From Swiss-Prot:
Keyword set includes Transmembrane helix: no
Binding site for substrate: 286-296
Name this polypeptide is given: Biosynthetic arginine decarboxylase
Catalytic activity: L-arginine + H(+) = agmatine + CO2
Job of this protein: Catalyzes the biosynthesis of agmatine from arginine.
The EC number(s) this enzyme carries: 4.1.1.19
GN (gene name): speA
Membership in a protein family: Belongs to the Orn/Lys/Arg decarboxylase class-II family. SpeA subfamily.
Organism name: Shewanella baltica (strain OS155 / ATCC BAA-1091)
Gene Ontology annotations of biological process type: arginine catabolic process; putrescine biosynthetic process from arginine; spermidine biosynthetic process
Length: 637
């Protein structure tokens, strides 16, 4: 493909659309990051960055964070709502609340809070969904607006801690998820002498579409029905505490792809708000929860991995709908709160790692079968001969299907003992030659050929064995078929000669990335430059900043990866600010209650029993280094 250009690479991997301008491909074919929107010309080459870290002793895989992206996401979201409020003459403000469940890493939370340090009135709060998260936000919320939203199921201790937050100077909204929580709040607030700020989560009838749609709707795990909301209002009235009810919350799901779903959800919740106001409740905050999507595949569509709207449209729709409803009911306009954690964090982190080996099909010449060979092999040779003579287009699919059928029969005959191992191997090679030849002759412009092209791309794809654990670093790719953009970090100035699939290093057949962004769609294989051990390239997994770290598990005892925080200074200099070491072997053993110290004593006993004296020190040192070492592969050259 002599006419290949960088623009082809950018379009082929759809970088321009899913990256939101933070990532790109340079004219030299290397993937870059532009983390500081104030200085868009300042770019970092990810390939060189990774090599510099390796030289400094940071082993791959490494998760690289770009905090300036977090700053930009916070401020762009606040700006979008500020502009919408001005456009529709909305009579209240907007507050962005970060739900730390999305990424609880200290660096992430602190950078999000620091993003508005220069603002006289920060538009930023924190959300907790459990007691550990609440303990964290109680210590951090004063760095922003001191607003804390408490979601999730609660016991008496959770409620006491939330009320203590009020004593510490925070504005803590305790959102009722169940009717029984109200009784606990009333009792604990009386005991502590604290007037609570109450919220309630409404269980909407409307249910948005998407992977997380069970978060909404009448069968939702969370929230109060209309009847239960009326009971809350009545009990608060009886206790002369109706003015404590200050916040209405609802949640459609974590990734709402269709803007119409958002409008419909806000419309229904807006009616709840106005009805509560009419009943005498002092509700002044309208919490739309999460739902602001991330366009993982860059298609700007209604697919589960995308979104059919932009940030401005999102803010405009919420503000517009709520303005109209409040005007219709002649109710005051409430402060708008959103909990847009996925939007804030997804783009800021990239996992970079190396390929430890590849397995690729290379066409081999095949000789005709011996005359006494089973007729099946002669049939397969005939199919191959037809292709060698350049069969017409109509015959290609028939020849391909015949070859697949013959291969299945060959496997059956081998299992019955009617085909030797050598004959089976010949049949498999003949089938691969047919597949390879057919692949080169089919045309994507022919709609009848497209399904076969997809099959062959998958069948003949190279296998890249990549130094990472899918279950640790991309758990949503395994658990819910989430798509994450994957790119070689260099060599993109040349046309991709191969297609590949990425396999992790766990001992699990599920450890494979089976969906890839390819142009304006999703494919089961990834176009890649030709691989060479003499000039290898690194692989980047993008948009992994939301949920992946905390959801990741230790399958095969592969632990947390190394991580680094990287920033571009005002003078354009790249600064690796901090490096956090990943788990050692001893660390992950400790997680499952295995004692590395006791293991070392056992090793010493075994070494003294079985190893010659002149080798003992070397063997013990190797074992000790193994316990202190990285859980990922470091020595495979």
């Amino acid at each position: 493909m002599n006419d290949w250009s960088i623009d082809d690479a950018r379009a082929g991997y759809n970088v321009t659309h899913w990256s939101q301008g933070f990532y790109g491909i340079s004219d030299h074919g290397e993937v870059t990051v532009s983390p500081d929107p104030k200085n868009p010309d300042y770019k970092i080459g990810l390939n060189e960055l990774a090599k510099d870290m390796v030289k400094a002793g940071v082993a791959l895989p490494v998760l690289v964070r770009f905090p300036q992206i977090l700053h930009h996401r916070v401020n762009s979201l606040c700006q979008a709502f500020d502009q919408a409020i001005q456009k529709y003459e909305y009579q209240a403000d907007y507050l962005l609340v970060y739900p730390i469940k999305v990424n609880q890493q200290q660096t992430v939370v602190e950078e999000i809070l620091a993003s508005q340090a220069s603002k006289e009135v920060p538009q930023l709060g924190l959300e907790a969904g459990s007691k550990p998260e609440l303990m964290a936000v109680l210590a951090m919320a004063q760095k922003a607006s001191s607003v804390i939203v408490c979601n999730g199921y609660k016991d008496n201790e959770y409620i006491r801690l939330a009320l203590i937050g009020e004593k510490l100077g925070h504005k803590v909204y305790i959102v009722l998820e169940k009717l029984s929580e109200l009784k606990m709040v009333l009792a604990e607030s009386k005991r502590l002498g604290v007037t609570p700020r109450l919220g309630l989560r409404a269980r909407l009838a409307f249910q948005g579409k998407g992977k997380w749609q069970a978060s909404g709707g009448e069968k939702s795990k969370f929230g109060l029905s209309a009847a239960q909301i009326l009971l809350v209002v009545e009990q608060l009235k009886q206790n002369d505490m109706l003015d404590s009810l200050q916040l209405l919350h609802f949640h459609l799901g974590s990734q709402i792809a269709n803007i119409r779903d958002i409008r419909q959800g806000v419309s229904e919740a807006g009616r709840f708000y106005c009805e509560l106001r009419a009943l005498g409740a002092s509700v002044n905050c309208f919490d739309v929860g999460g739902g602001l999507a991330v366009d993982y595949d860059g298609t700007r569509s209604q697919s589960n991995n995308s979104m059919n709207y932009g940030l401005t449209e999102y803010a405009n729709n919420i503000v517009n709908v709520l303005t109209d409803i409040c005007n219709e009911y002649e109710q005051p306009m409430p402060r708008i709160i959103s909990e847009s954690g996925r939007y804030l964090t997804a783009h800021h982190a990239v996992l970079i790692t190396d390929v430890i080996g590849t397995e690729a099909y290379q066409p081999e010449d095949i000789q005709p079968p011996a005359e006494e060979s089973p007729q099946l092999l002669h049939n397969m040779w005939h199919s191959w001969s037809e292709l060698s003579g350049r069969a017409d287009q109509r015959a290609l699919i028939e020849i391909y299907h015949d070859s697949q059928s013959d291969l299945q029969e060959a496997h059956s005959l081998f299992a019955l003992g009617q085909l030797s191992l050598a004959e089976r191997a010949w049949a498999e090679q003949a089938n691969l030659r047919v597949c390879h030849e057919v692949q080169g002759l089919l045309s994507a412009k022919n709609r009848y050929h497209r399904p076969i092209i997809d099959e062959l791309n998958e069948k003949l794809a190279d296998k890249f064995f990549v130094n990472f654990s899918l279950f640790q670093s991309l758990p949503d790719a395994w658990g819910i078929d989430q798509v994450f953009p994957v790119l070689p970090l260099s060599g993109l100035d040349k046309a991709p000669e191969r297609r590949a699939v990425m396999l992790d290093i766990t001992c699990d057949s599920d450890g494979i990335v089976d969906q890839y962004v390819d142009g304006q769609g999703i494919e089961t294989t990834l176009p890649v430059p030709a691989w060479s051990a003499d000039s290898p390239y690194l692989i980047g997994f993008f948009l992994v900043g939301a949920y992946q770290e905390i959801l990741g598990d230790m399958h095969n005892l592969f632990g947390d990866t190394n991580s680094a925080v990287v920033r571009i200074e005002d003078n354009g200099v790249t600064n690796i600010e901090s490096v956090l070491a990943g788990d050692t072997v001893a660390d992950v053993l400790r997680y499952v209650n295995l004692d590395a110290v006791a293991f070392m004593r056992t090793y010493e006993e075994l070494v003294n029993l079985h190893i010659a004296e002149d080798e003992r020190a070397q063997i013990l040192e190797e074992l000790q280094v193994g316990l202190k070492g990285y859980t990922y592969l470091e020595d495979f050259s």
